[in-house]
Design a protein with these regions (language model features):
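N-terminal secretory signal peptides that target proteins for export/translocation
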Residues: 1-15
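Extracytoplasmic substrate-binding proteins
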Residues: 156, 169, 173, 177-267, ...
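Flexible, glycine-rich surface segments
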Residues: 249-333
Length: 334
């Protein structure tokens, strides 16, 4: 069958690995020239009793968070236009009186983090902050980042359960001072509520909602605020900016690329055309297909297609990249 022959072609070649390498490089690239004055344009400065506003963090691409700095080292983090708000209090400083009940206090040092949002680990690595992560929501064999695997091997980082089933006893015994979750936690709101009842602040990171891949990378600046590593984050950001500048002179190859996986129902899950993966392909000099994927306005970054429709739109793609990170590798066409 022609379909079977085409599916066999999906066993990736050296060319696939080459373009995948380019895409991985783009994951860590973080700068161009566009400025996003998120805090200044979209939100007013919060008046906190006893604190004096100083300045706001300058962000290049990230649109899902903002940081306002106050005198004496205080910092206010707002996520998703203030849906979640955190006040980072420097070590040795007092929590302001009469603080709004919607503001969660994060007292530095923050060095017993329960990291459930796996995508954040590489950003912590970039700012030399993995030592501040005591608990992991991913087992040792699930990490591809050497520093994370090593930390779990030597006991510096412990497994404390996945997002839907955390080990509360372990989390409490390790004096966890912050849980960083992905938006998957909203599927189990009782877990977030329980952690907060136990006195553990929960920060839900939304880097996956950034429309530009560089916006995702810029979340390292938020984590740097937690750890007091802003200079390290700025340095890492600038280093990646130089890499992008070198790549920006490359001409568009015109090569078409499909990025997908087959879900448990047999449907093909693809990235929408506005998603960060689609943007990475564009930045790497390619053209994402299907080009018309996801013209609707909902916030989801992926969509499902029937196999026949996907085949019709992607059969002539120059490169087919299978996303095995979700449901594993494709072993057969059955």
């Amino acid at each position: 069958m022609e379909l079977e022959k085409e599916m066999k072609y999906w066993k990736w070649t050296k060319q696939i690995r080459r373009i995948s390498g380019i895409l991985l490089l783009m994951l860590s690239v973080c700068a161009l020239s566009r400025q996003t004055a998120f805090a200044e344009e979209n939100q007013e400065v919060v008046d906190i009793p006893g604190l004096v506003y100083d300045h706001s963090m300058e962000l290049v691409y990230a649109e899902e968070f903002s940081v306002d700095y106050y005198k004496e080292g205080y910092a206010l983090i707002r996520i998703h236009q203030g849906e979640e708000t955190f006040l980072v209090v420097p070590e040795g400083k007092e929590v302001p009186d009469n603080l709004d009940s919607n503001i969660t206090v994060l007292q530095q040092p923050i060095n017993h983090i329960y990291l459930v949002a796996t995508s954040a680990m590489d950003l912590f690595r970039a700012i030399d902050g993995i030592d501040s992560i005591r608990l992991s929501g991913t087992k040792e064999d699930g990490w591809y980042i050497p520093e994370a695997k090593e930390a779990m091997e030597n006991g510096a980082m412990l497994y404390a359960g996945k997002y839907s089933a955390p080990d509360y006893e372990e989390i409490l015994s390790e004096q966890c001072d912050l849980a960083i979750e992905s938006t998957m936690i909203y599927h189990n709101p009782e877990v977030k509520e329980k952690l907060e009842q136990l006195g553990i602040p929960v920060l839900v990171e939304r880097s996956s909602y950034e429309s530009h891949p560089l916006g995702r990378t810029e979340w390292m600046k938020l984590y740097a605020v937690l750890l007091g590593k802003e200079e390290a984050a700025e340095t890492a950001f600038e280093e990646q900016a130089e890499k992008l500048e070198a790549l920006s002179s490359e001409e568009n190859t015109g090569k078409t690329v499909a990025f997908f996986y087959i879900n448990s129902t047999g449907a093909v899950n693809v990235r929408k055309s506005h998603d960060y993966v689609s943007k990475m392909i564009e930045l790497a000099g390619g053209v994402y297909v299907p080009e018309d994927a996801g013209s609707d306005d909902n916030a989801l970054s992926t969509m499902n297609m029937q196999m026949e429709e996907f085949y019709a739109k992607a059969k002539n793609a120059d490169y087919l990249i299978y996303n095995s990170a979700i449901d594993g590798e494709l072993e057969s066409i059955d």
